[in-house]
Swiss-Prot record:
It is an enzyme of class 2 (transferase). It is found in: Cytoplasm. This is Carbamate kinase. The keyword Transferase applies. Its main location: cytoplasm. Belongs to the carbamate kinase family. GO terms for biological process: arginine deiminase pathway. It catalyses: hydrogencarbonate + NH4(+) + ATP = carbamoyl phosphate + ADP + H2O + H(+). Keywords: Arginine metabolism, ATP-binding, Cytoplasm, Kinase, Nucleotide-binding, Transferase. Its EC number is 2.7.2.2. Gene3D superfamilies: Acetylglutamate kinase-like. It comes from the Bacteria. GO terms for cellular component: cytosol.
Length: 310
């Protein structure tokens, strides 16, 4: 039996609540399949599209005097509950259909970051909707947001993405796992908080990369494997070129060379690779599997996906 952290990509969960719910139902079948095979899993998820849409909608309401403005940390908390609820319900239903008596809990999770992290001066995490270049330029002029081109899919707003330092609710996660509870935690990388005087915490406007927090969580609870589910089947080098090549198996030294060659896009594949390296460096006997959400079953059989080891 292996202990596995499964990190679901926010972009892989669809573009609407309805699409997300259908994708989550299918994902629940694969995740419960891991449980029936004797594995112990903890689930994390991204929230890039969802938190951006929540923030956009609340800002629109505030600008039209239809409600108050909300800080980004609160938007992150809303996205954790919204995505977590759909995952939790789908998993509960699938477990029940399989005759498995197991509790599922979504834990709103805070993650400590450093207020002095240089990421606050260099926003890099894409969130929200995809725009054309013309639309992005117009919004940038109107609102002052920063945009980047995101892996050939369009332009997206970027926000600071500081490094996760510690998971505030870690002991609660451990206790739940030890008591045979299926835990959904660290959604969207966790709500970023900074430590103030007397060890109190305060939310800060940012989005932590969910794969980096998932790698930290995996190391903290001594997992055997980190599975990162995204929108593509493999990690590629020379992506979107005539020389595009899928990586089926690789190791962290090779990946470090590819990072030096700038093979991986910032804000999309690069943090996944950095997270894989971090997880394995903290757990040399562990492995990382990166593949698409709808190919999880095939990837677990070794038929598809990128497997990373030391």
């Amino acid at each position: 039996m292996a202990k596995i952290v499964v990190a679901l990509g926010g972009n892989a969960l669809g573009k609407s609540p309805q699409e997300q719910l259908e994708l989550v139902k299918n994902t629940a079948k694969s995740l419960v399949g891991l449980i029936t095979k004797g594995h112990e899993i903890v689930i994390s998820h991204g929230n890039g599209p969802q938190v951006g849409s929540i923030n956009l909608g609340l800002n629109y309401a505030a600008e039209h005097d239809q409600g108050p403005a909300f800080p980004f940390a609160e938007c992150g908390a809303m996205s954790q509950a919204y995505i977590g609820y759909q995952l939790q319900e789908s998993l509960q239903n699938e477990l029940h259909s399989m005759g498995i008596d197991k509790q599922v809990v979504t834990l709103v999770t805070q993650v400590e970051v450093d207020e002095g992290d240089p990421a606050f001066n260099s926003p890099s995490k894409p969130i929200g909707l995809f725009y054309t270049k013309e639309e992005a330029n117009r919004i940038q002029q109107e609102k002052g947001y920063q945009f980047v081109e995101d892996a050939g899919r369009g332009y997206r707003r970027v926000v600071p993405s500081p490094q996760p330092i510690s998971i505030i609710e870690l002991e609660s996660i451990k206790t739940l796992v030890e008591n045979d509870t299926l835990v959904i935690a660290a959604g969207g990388g966790g709500i970023p908080v900074i430590r103030e005087q007397h060890d109190s915490f305060k939310g800060i406007d940012a989005v932590i990369d969910k794969d980096k927090t998932s790698a930290l969580l995996g190391a903290d609870i001594h997992c055997d494997q980190l599975i990162i589910l995204t929108a593509i089947d493999y990690v590629y080098i020379n992506y979107h070129t005539d020389q595009q090549q899928a990586l089926k198996t690789t190791n962290i030294d090779t990946l470090k060379t590819y990072i030096e060659e700038e093979q991986f896009a910032k804000g999309s594949m690069l943090p996944k690779i950095e997270s894989a390296i971090s997880f394995i460096e903290n757990n040399p006997n562990g492995s990382v599997l990166i593949t698409s959400l709808n190919q999880l079953d095939a990837a677990l059989e070794g038929k598809i996906g990128t497997l990373i080891t030391k």
